[in-house]
Swiss-Prot record:
Record-linked PANTHER family: NAD KINASE
UniProt keywords, alphabetically: ATP-binding, Cytoplasm, Kinase, NAD, NADP, Nucleotide-binding, Transferase
Gene3D superfamilies, A to Z: Probable inorganic polyphosphate/atp-NAD kinase, domain 1, Probable inorganic polyphosphate/atp-NAD kinase, domain 2
Compartment(s): Cytoplasm
GO CC term (a single one): cytoplasm
Main localization, broad class: cytoplasm
Protein name per the record: NAD kinase
Free-text function comment from the UniProt entry: Involved in the regulation of the intracellular balance of NAD and NADP, and is a key enzyme in the biosynthesis of NADP. Catalyzes specifically the phosphorylation on 2'-hydroxyl of the adenosine moiety of NAD to yield NADP.
UniProt cross-references to HAMAP family, sorted A to Z: NAD_kinase
Gene Ontology molecular functions: ATP binding; metal ion binding; NAD binding; NAD+ kinase activity
UniProt-annotated binding residues for NAD(+): D49, G50, R54, N118, E119, D148, A156, T159, A160, Y161, N162, Y163, S164, A183
Family membership noted in the UniProt record: Belongs to the NAD kinase family.
Species this protein is from: Xylella fastidiosa (strain 9a5c)
Requisite cofactors: a divalent metal cation
Length: 259
């Protein structure tokens, strides 16, 4: 389904600090003009997936759709860079994403909240394996996971770190989350689970002083956590725009057959 866009949408161009992205921004601004975030109909993010995630974290609450163009090393969430931007915006297909909402408690008693569009990952901070218990909707499912850590990934993020950790690729719009252990030692046979998107997930670090654990929501890291609660956000939603010949749903599907 294509998204209705005005014939000459007002575009705010955003770019990573990389020289190719900065140069492209200047060229596009000279051709199409530029406006503020507040006045824009659409945001155009120039860079890689890392910059796209930073753009969503910074401007996601604005409600503006975001069209990304790949000028970085990784561009799963981006479109290819082309000159015919207005035509591509007219034909673009929207993908609506809900981020994960994370609440972390640290050893010192500090509570930290963050959003994640790709994944939330708990990781051991030292050479010693982490001990983590896993509760789903208030019920303990794993008394003690021993390993490097654990990931909760959205469908959009399931092809990234989650997939590298041998987690499942989730179809876009499936309203599911991937729960994937990282290098698990015990339970030996547990390889993760696919959860409904409205599941409340709670991790407790069982030996935080001897075996400290950090948590990262996309790129926001909090160290020395003792408890982490994750649920899908019910308040925030972002819209990414993709070229119809290679939309996000097709990209996720294609990743399952990559060799």
């Amino acid at each position: 389904m294509e998204m209705m866009m005005t014939a000459a949408p007002r575009i705010a161009f955003l770019a990573s600090t990389a020289e190719p992205a900065q140069r492209a921004r200047q060229e596009l601004m000279a051709r199409y003009g530029d406006c503020s975030i507040e006045e824009a109909d659409v945001l155009c993010a120039l860079g890689g997936d890392g910059f796209m995630l930073r753009t969503l974290h910074r401007y996601g609450a604005s409600g503006k759709p975001v069209y990304g163009m790949k000028l970085g090393s990784v561009g799963f969430l981006m479109n290819q860079y082309h000159d015919d931007l207005l035509e591509r915006l007219q034909r673009a297909e929207p993908a609506k994403l809900r981020p994960l909402q994370m609440m972390a408690q640290t050893e010192s008693g500090v509570s930290v909240e963050s959003l994640a569009y790709n994944e939330v990952s708990l990781l051991r901070q030292t050479h010693q394996a982490a001990y983590i218990s896993i509760d789903l909707n208030g019920q303990t499912r794993i008394d003690e996971l021993t390993g490097d850590g654990v990931i909760v990934a959205t469908p959009a993020g399931s092809t990234a770190y989650n997939y590298s950790a041998h987690g499942p690729i989730l179809p876009l719009g499936s309203h599911t989350l991937a729960l994937t252990p990282i290098a698990p030692y015990r339970p030996r046979r547990w390889r993760g689970a696919i959860l409904k998107a409205d599941t409340e997930i709670r991790f407790r670090v069982l030996d935080p002083y001897k075996r400290p654990v950090s948590v990262t929501a996309d790129s926001h890291e909090i160290r020395d956590v003792v408890e982490v609660t994750i649920r899908e956000s019910t308040e925030q939603r972002v819209t990414l725009l993709f070229d119809p010949e290679h939309n996000l749903e097709e990209r996720i599907f294609s990743e399952q057959f990559a060799v």
